[in-house]
Amino acid sequence: MRYAIVFFLVCVITLGEALKCVNLQANGIKMTQECAKEDTKCLTLRSLKKTLKFCASGRTCTTMKIMSLPGEQITCCEGNMCNA
């Protein structure tokens, strides 16, 4: 039971960080140009109206793919491809 609670909290924190990045970019706040060391992938979130790109860890990519809404397309690229 403890492991389930810890896993849930880790997922919530990870998803919260990813959503924070999306919200920052959606609100027009300039994000850093370079990814952090742990962010080895570029996550692209495509919805009906917007396409958002940000750096993410492998775990964040997996979580976002699982938690995506219908109509959203999420892809993850290797390396720092967000600025391309």
Curated annotation (Swiss-Prot):
It is found in: Secreted. Expressed by the skin dorsal glands. Keywords: Amphibian defense peptide, Disulfide bond, Secreted, Signal. One of its GO terms (cellular component) is extracellular region. Disulfide bonds join C21-C42, C35-C55, C61-C76, C77-C82. Residues 1-18 form the signal peptide. This is Xenoxin-1.
